[in-house]
């Protein structure tokens, strides 16, 4: 049985860094982003990978059901028993599809959804302060924040009703945040 943990949060919340640090320092955990999972599936040469490559190579979005199947495939083929995926789900549709697929199999159990909570001001300061790419500007940040905020209430409600949602204060030092998430993961396994 694989234990699945989802880490969600606003752009700049630190969710990817948090998940990466946990996986680097605890060999029981693997960390994936959705993009990593899709690229790994393509690299595997599987039929699913060929299907994904057909969309990506033409610059098209990969259909939702294909993305979720890639996530499930990567989780099942991982040599780790605890999987952290950050930044997923990003929409009610993604959440619903993942829930449907997970309910149809018995090899993966969703153990928790961790929201790294930061204010919009903190998120903005972090994203604009890091300026990792050309897309790290105020206009793009506002759009990314809207994409995050629009579905977050129904996503929180859905996972709260399943008693899976755990909120961590992301406005502290990285060591404190990671320690809190590690403690939470240990309780949920």
Curated annotation (Swiss-Prot):
InterPro entries: Adenylat/UMP-CMP_kin (IPR000850), Adenylat_kinase_CS (IPR033690), P-loop_NTPase (IPR027417)
Disulfide bonds: none
Region entry LID, spans: 129-135
Region (NMP): 33-62
GO molecular function, a single term: ATP binding
Reaction equation(s) it catalyzes: AMP + ATP = 2 ADP
EC primary class: transferase
Localization terms from the record: Cytoplasm
Enzyme Commission number(s): 2.7.4.3
Keywords: ATP-binding, Cytoplasm, Kinase, Nucleotide biosynthesis, Nucleotide-binding, Transferase
Superkingdom as given in the UniProt entry: Bacteria
Keyword Nucleotide-binding: yes
Residues that, per the record, bind AMP: 34, 39, 60-62, 87-90, 94, 132, 144
Function: Catalyzes the reversible transfer of the terminal phosphate group between ATP and AMP. Plays an important role in cellular energy homeostasis and in adenine nucleotide metabolism.
Quaternary context: Monomer.
PANTHER family recorded: NUCLEOTIDE KINASE (PTHR23359)
Recorded family membership: Belongs to the adenylate kinase family.
Domain notes: Consists of three domains, a large central CORE domain and two small peripheral domains, NMPbind and LID, which undergo movements during catalysis. The LID domain closes over the site of phosphoryl transfer upon ATP binding. Assembling and dissambling the active center during each catalytic cycle provides an effective means to prevent ATP hydrolysis.
HAMAP family, sorted: Adenylate_kinase_Adk (MF_00235)
Name of this protein: Adenylate kinase
Phylogenetic classification of the source organism: Bacteria, Pseudomonadati, Campylobacterota, Epsilonproteobacteria, Campylobacterales
């Amino acid at each position: 049985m694989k234990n699945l943990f989802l880490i969600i949060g606003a752009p700049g919340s630190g969710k990817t860094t948090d998940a990466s640090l946990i996986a680097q320092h605890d060999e029981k955990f693997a960390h994936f982003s959705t993009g990593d999972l899709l690229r790994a599936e393509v690299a595997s040469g599987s039929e699913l990978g060929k299907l994904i490559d057909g969309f990506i190579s033409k610059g098209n979005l990969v259909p939702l059901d294909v993305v979720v199947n890639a996530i499930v495939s990567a989780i099942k083929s991982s040599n780790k028993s605890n999987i952290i995926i950050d930044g997923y789900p990003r929409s009610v549709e993604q959440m619903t599809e993942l829930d449907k697929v997970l309910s149809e199999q018995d090899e993966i159990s969703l153990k928790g959804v961790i929201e790294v909570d930061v204010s919009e001001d903190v998120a903005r300061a972090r994203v604009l302060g890091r300026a990792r790419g050309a897309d790290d500007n105020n206009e793009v940040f506002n759009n990314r924040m809207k994409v995050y905020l629009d579905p977050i209430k129904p996503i929180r409600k859905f996972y709260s009703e399943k008693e899976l949602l755990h909120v961590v204060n992301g406005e502290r030092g990285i060591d404190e945040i990671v320690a809190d998430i590690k403690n939470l993961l240990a309780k949920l396994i």
